[in-house]
Amino acid sequence: MIELQAINVSFQQKEKTIQAVKQVDLSIAKGDVYGIVGYSGAGKSTLVRVMNLLQKPTSGKVIINGTELGKLSPKELRKERKSIGMIFQHFHLMESRTIFDNVDFSLKYTKKSKQERRQKVNELLTLVGLEEKATAYPKQLSGGQKQRVAIARALASDPQVLLCDEATSALDPKTTHQILALLKKLNQQLGLTIVLITHEMQVVKEICNKVAVMENGEVIEQGSSVQIFSAPKEVLTQEFIRTATHVDQALETICSHRAFADQLTNKWLVELSYVGTQTNEPLIAQLYSKYQVSANILYGNVELLQETPLGRLIVTLSGEIHQREKALAYLIESGVQATILQKNGASKEMKVIQGGR
């Protein structure tokens, strides 16, 4: 569907060359909801603009449905861009026009008759849940409603791809969830391929089936959402995921609050992560029956990501030291990732033990 091959983007600032995107290769399949995540300045917004040549790459190829965009004439490129819709953080609505007219403007230069355009606009407004706001003006709408108008406008040309550049960044959490639910519906109902640019891993977790992580213009890690969330390799990816899963907040509370001090004395504080069918197995209960190691759960979270269960626990382990080591080995053999956070109440450099089958 979308192929980016060896993409580089450089900007000249006086005598200095800024390389915003460095040797990026991406493959996005039809029907994907593909998240590209990174901090500000990572190059993700530049990269998404390359996908429809709003930003021409310094080098590399952009291929959409087998067509290399860089080889098209201006007329051919304009035609190809109709298959690629785009929405932004800011809505760019025309304040003096009604919601109906804002969407209709996208159809102004098509060959559709006035009646066909009216029917199309009404269909789009119904699709995004704004059929009752057709005669309203942008100033009468909330931020979430304005973004729905922008989505309807972007869908006017019946695109196969929708590029979303920080589309939820200006919205509150509840409205963000509603917009993401709408995008998911469009993906499923229309078969729309969506590329989502964001700095929030929570957004990726909620909607994306694949994700790429960018840092300093490079894609440092990419894969399925389940793969990235269950076994992140890069430090930056781990930081993003820990923020999205609230593990660090739980750890801070556990390690700083007096109420937990006695529970950490002469015990190991361990973080456990597991995925898929492992969440169905009573592994914690078996630690005592097999090794006489008691596990006290201080924090736990199980959630579904792309219909796959992901679990995270923070536990204390007590018992004979050699038995604790055997218990950890058993967890690892069962496919659990274990991170020893503290030993006997003393903080230590985290030791990550990766389990897998």
PLM ranges: what are they?
Residues 136-139, 156-157, 164:
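Conserved signature/switch motifs of ABC ATPase nucleotide-binding domains
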Residues 222-223, 231:
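ABC ATPase "signature
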